């Protein structure tokens, strides 16, 4: 589904440069009985130092159109934190995310519930996660032993009649317990 290569120039012993795949992803996604969604995505490329093989990115099941919330999702997926982290890199303007993004939790295992209100002008998501992405480092320490609560609320207080111009405001929080 997605393939991206890069030409890094770095010194690793006798190798001064090389070619590597930044991402080589294959995924499947769908809906069963109109109210059960699923996605499984595997990245075959080496993603970070210390990771010699691929890894799962998204593996989840979601229940749609629930009584008090729009959606409940369980599995391994991105925590609802930061407008810059959530969108796919396919929709990014720049090649890299900003430096501040290194402090954002990424893919972890958890459960979220979300709801849109006021004609989809207000949206909130709340979730509990088990830290599994070894953030902030890729060493073999006990950093992956904690749990976290993450929430995000976004709103569109003003929207032009053409629908293309609007003001988007949002806030998110994250509390980790190592």
Give, region by region, the residue ranges found by the protein language model.
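Outer membrane beta-barrel
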Residues: 1-134, 139-178
């Amino acid at each position: 589904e997605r393939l991206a290569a890069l030409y890094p120039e770095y010194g690793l012993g006798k190798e001064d440069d090389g070619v590597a795949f930044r991402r080589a992803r294959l995924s499947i996604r769908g809906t069963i009985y109109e109210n059960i969604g699923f996605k499984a995505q595997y990245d075959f490329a080496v993603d970070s130092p210390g990771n010699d093989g691929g890894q799962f990115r998204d593996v989840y099941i979601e229940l749609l159109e629930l009584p008090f919330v729009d959606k409940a999702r369980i599995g391994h997926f991105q925590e609802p934190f930061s407008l810059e982290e959530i969108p796919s890199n396919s929709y990014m303007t720049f090649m890299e995310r900003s430096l501040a993004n290194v402090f954002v939790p990424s893919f972890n295992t958890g459960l979220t519930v979300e709801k849109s209100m006021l004609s989809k002008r207000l949206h909130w998501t709340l979730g509990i996660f088990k830290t599994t992405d070894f953030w902030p480092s890729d060493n073999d320490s006990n950093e992956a032993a904690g749990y976290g609560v993450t929430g995000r609320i976004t709103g569109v207080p003003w929207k032009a009649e053409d629908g293309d111009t609007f003001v988007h405001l949002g806030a998110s929080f994250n509390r980790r317990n190592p």
